[in-house]
Every structure is written in structure tokens, then in C-alpha cells.
């Protein structure tokens, strides 16, 4: 008699229908490709722009090895996390709609609150990082126009505050989209844009290497005493920059905190866990190839002077029109990525508000507005006020602290170990009843502890960088 594991059966869960899923919610429509688009939109973001700088800090050996290791860890722990979307049976078990729901079902207790704080602080910080990155790209577009008129030697300093405000206004509008599932089209557009500017950066890097007639860089990266764009590198700076570069690479692979929310958009059959494993493999494989190419080619082109933002910090100067297209693509991508990251935070706050104030019309009432022919738009006053306040806050903080590389490194360090490694590992151990002190348990714990040390080191390097920047920075005078 052949016994087949129920996890391998692509069956439709009970109590589902043509219009609704087994949990009574509207039928989910996500596929491998839409899930991959969501992930790629989240992963290939502004982090790719700092990879050449990160590789420059640790060299031709450390750079590629670090990217490969981070990609492996991210893929492996993401497959563990995929298994936690449903509690119990992976096909018919109770759904966990958010990352925190999965923590609550599998771990419970104080870990739920700790996870919530880390996850939502990281999402909040990512919104700040994306606002800064968008302003840098818009400033770069204005700078190329200025240098076309005044010559390439004109520094053309531009205040980025107006662009941060403009980006914030756009986000206020898009943030009124009620649900994550309705963002599929924005994610696809953003994913296409991410490929576009990554490809342009890669092409410009290759052309720069050909122009130089040499491959720059060294096996161990920037050496003590080297004069870079930001000054002479001291021994302590070498250490802190090495740690910060690990944070930048970790941030480039950061998406675990929204993986469960993405999985909740996927239809079944086939089982959601199978779809997400495929989507995770496709996404991580594609992004790793892009990261290796962009980071290594950028380092080969500029060596120790690789800029913090490959397309906007003066690394390339020609052709102007292509640089403008690349930076515009970055901005369009960041509009979508901002929403992909913030929707889980929006949903959490609105769910809590509805639970605490179920009788309040301000919180719960949906006002139907017919903007265009067809389906009316649902306007919720609490959603309007809260999401607008959130965007305004992230914009204000971005104007106060526009340190792209340091912020990116700190975000990567804060989020990588707890969200990408620790909680997925602990949930998997709890759900699968992995025996304590068994071989698998020990291997998982070694992985977790190793990543903890990496995160602490990366956070320290980024904090030192922010402190150094604050010594010379004047608030609301963000010139790039």
C-alpha cells in the first residue's frame, strides 16, 4: 500500500467555492509569477545601488562570497517560513495572514510582541530609506541637466528636500489603495523598472571597465591609508566599513518580513507552500545574479572609489539621457516598493483600530466614491488620516537624516537576524517538532547564532557611520 504525504497533494481546501476561499475571504488569484514580482519588487530595490561600495570594502574575495552566503541563508530560511503560512497541515490548516500571525500560532508569548516591534520598525525604516533613495535619484536627474548647461566640472549641489516632499505626496495617494492584493499591477511595473535600472547600471559598468582597460580593485578591498571620495581610510574606518558593508548586503536581501503577506495573495491549488517555494527560488536566483553582476562590475569599474549610490553619486557622467532614464526607473520602482513594504504595517494598525473601536464609524465605515466608470472606490476616513500621517512622518525623518548608506546598513542589520533567520528557524522547529540537540536542531542553531554575530557587527558599523555624519550635518539642508 502506497501512502502519499498530504503535503504533496495539490488539493483544494475544504469549504472553498468559486468566489471564496476556505477562510471565507474573496478568492485569491496570485501565482508563482505574481508572487515572484512582489518579491523582486521588494528585494531588487535601492539596496542594489550600494553593492559596488559594499564589495569595495571587502574586496574580490569577501564581496562575492558574502553575497552568495546571504542569498543561500535568505533562500533557506524563506523556505522554512513558507511552511508556517498554515498552522498544522500545510494544505488545509488554519491560515496565518501576517508574519505576526505566524509567530503567534507557532511560538506565542513575548516573542509575538518582540517580532511585531522589530518587523514594523524595520518596515518603517525601509520607508525612510526608500524616500531618501528616491530623492537622491531625482536630484541626480536635475544635476545632469545642470551639468549639461554649466559643464561637467560644476558640482551643481541640489537640495533634496523638495523631492522628498514630492515623493511623499505621491505615496499619500498610492497609500489609499486598501489591500495588498490590489497592488499586483504596481508590483509588476516596479519589478520591470528594477530590472531596467539594474541593467543600465550593469551596462555602464561594463563600458567603464572597457574604457579603463583594466579591472580595478583588490582581493581584500579598501586598504588603510587609501584616499577615497570621503577621505583617507583609517584602520578603525576599515573595520567599521567592513561591518557596514555586510549590513548593506543583508538589506539587499531583505524581504522575509513581508513573505507571509505575499503568500496570502497566492491561490490554491496548488498548495500555497509549493507556489511560494518556487517563487522564492526564482526570485532569489534572479536577484543574486543581478547583485553579483552589479556589485562586481561596479567595483571593477571604480575600485576603491566605488560610490555609495552607483547611479546617482557621480560614478557615471555619460550618457546623460541614459542616466536620467535609469534614475527615473529607480524612482518608479521605489514608489511601488514603498507600498509593498508599508501595506503590512498599514493593515496591522487598521486591524487593531477596528478591534479596539468596532462601533466607531470613523474607523470602520467605508464610503463608496464613484471616481471612474465601474467599481466604486472605498474611502475610509481612518485609513485616509492614518496613512497620510505615516507618509508625512517618514518624509520628515528622511529630511532630518538623509544618510543613504548608513541607513541602509542599519536597516539590514536590524532586520536580518531576527526576521530572516531567528523567527523562521524557531517557528520551523516548533511546527515540525525538531528534537532538541538533534543534528538538525544543532545545525539550525549554529546558523542562527552565526547570523546574530554578523547582524551585531553590521549594526555597530552603521551606527558609527551615522554618528560621524551627524557631526557635520545640518537638519533640513540635505544637499546631494
Swiss-Prot record:
Subcellular location: Cell membrane
Basic and acidic residues bias locations: 11-25
Positions on the Extracellular side per record topology: 142-157, 204-241, 302-328, 405-406, 467-480
Membrane topology (UniProt): Multi-pass membrane protein
Regulation: Inhibited by 2,4-dinitrophenol.
Annotated segments matching region Disordered: 1-25
A Gene Ontology term for the protein's cellular component: plasma membrane
One GO-annotated biological process of the protein: basic amino acid transport
Effect of loss of the gene: No visible phenotype, but decreased uptake of L-arginine and L-lysine.
A Gene Ontology molecular function term of the record: symporter activity
Additional note from the record: Basic amino acids are transported in their fully ionized form.
Family classification: Belongs to the amino acid/polyamine transporter 2 family. Amino acid/auxin permease (AAAP) (TC 2.A.18.2) subfamily.
Protein name from the UniProt record: Amino acid permease 5
Organism listed in the record: Arabidopsis thaliana
Amino acid at each position: 500500500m502506497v501512502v502519499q504525504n498530504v503535503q504533496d497533494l495539490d488539493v483544494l481546501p475544504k469549504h472553498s467555492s468559486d468566489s471564496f476561499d476556505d477562510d471565507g475571504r474573496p478568492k485569491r488569484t496570485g501565482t508563482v509569477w505574481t508572487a515572484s514580482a512582489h518579491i523582486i519588487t521588494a528585494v531588487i530595490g535601492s539596496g542594489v545601488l550600494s553593492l559596488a561600495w559594499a564589495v569595495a570594502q571587502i574586496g574580490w574575495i569577501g564581496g562575492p562570497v558574502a553575497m552568495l552566503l546571504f542569498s543561500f541563508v535568505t533562500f533557506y530560511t524563506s523556505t522554512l517560513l513558507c511552511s508556517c503560512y498554515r498552522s498544522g497541515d500545510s494544505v488545509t490548516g488554519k491560515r496565518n495572514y501576517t508574519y505576526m500571525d505566524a509567530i503567534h500560532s507557532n511560538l506565542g508569548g513575548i516573542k509575538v510582541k518582540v517580532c511585531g516591534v522589530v518587523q514594523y520598525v524595520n518596515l518603517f525604516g525601509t520607508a525612510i530609506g526608500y524616500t531618501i533613495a528616491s530623492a537622491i535619484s531625482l536630484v541626480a536627474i536635475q544635476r545632469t541637466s545642470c551639468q549639461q548647461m554649466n559643464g561637467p566640472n560644476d558640482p551643481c549641489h541640489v537640495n533634496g528636500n523638495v523631492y522628498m516632499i514630492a515623493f511623499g505626496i505621491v505615496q499619500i495617494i498610492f497609500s489609499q489603495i486598501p489591500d495588498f492584493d490590489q497592488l499586483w499591477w504596481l508590483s509588476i511595473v516596479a519589478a520591470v523598472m528594477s530590472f531596467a535600472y539594474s541593467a543600465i547600471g550593469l551596462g555602464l559598468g561594463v563600458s567603464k571597465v572597457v574604457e579603463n582597460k583594466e579591472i580595478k580593485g583588490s582581493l581584500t578591498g579598501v586598504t588603510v591609508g587609501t584616499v577615497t571620495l570621503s577621505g583617507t581610510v583609517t584602520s578603525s574606518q576599515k573595520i567599521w566599513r567592513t561591518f557596514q558593508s555586510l549590513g548593506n548586503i543583508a538589506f539587499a536581501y531583505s524581504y522575509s518580513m513581508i513573505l507571509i503577506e505575499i503568500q496570502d495573495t497566492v491561490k490554491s491549488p496548488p498548495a500555497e507552500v509549493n507556489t511560494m517555494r518556487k517563487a522564492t527560488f526564482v526570485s532569489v536566483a534572479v536577484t543574486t545574479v543581478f547583485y553579483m553582476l552589479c556589485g562586481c562590475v561596479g567595483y571593477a569599474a571604480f575600485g576603491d572609489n566605488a560610490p555609495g549610490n552607483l547611479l546617482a553619486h557621480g560614478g557615471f557622467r555619460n550618457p546623460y539621457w541614459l542616466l536620467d532614464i535609469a534614475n527615473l526607473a529607480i524612482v518608479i520602482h521605489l514608489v511601488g516598493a514603498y507600498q509593498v513594504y508599508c501595506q503590512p504595517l498599514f493593515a496591522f494598525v487598521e486591524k487593531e483600530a477596528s478591534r479596539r473601536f468596532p462601533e466607531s464609524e470613523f474607523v470602520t465605515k467605508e464610503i463608496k466614491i464613484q471616481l471612474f466608470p465601474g467599481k466604486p472606490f472605498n474611502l475610509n476616513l481612518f485609513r485616509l488620516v492614518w496613512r497620510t500621517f505615516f507618509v508625512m512622518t517618514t518624509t520628515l525623518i528622511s529630511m532630518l537624516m538623509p544618510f543613504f548608506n548608513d541607513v541602509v546598513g542599519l536597516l539590514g542589520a536590524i532586520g536580518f537576524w531576527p526576521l530572516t533567520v531567528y523567527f523562521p528557524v524557531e517557528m520551523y522547529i516548533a511546527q515540525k517538532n525538531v528534537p532538541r540537540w538533534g543534528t538538525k536542531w544543532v545545525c539550525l542553531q549554529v546558523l542562527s547564532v552565526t547570523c546574530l554575530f554578523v547582524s551585531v557587527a553590521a549594526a555597530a558599523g552603521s551606527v558609527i557611520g551615522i554618528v560621524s555624519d551627524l557631526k557635520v550635518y545640518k537638519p533640513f539642508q540635505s544637499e546631494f
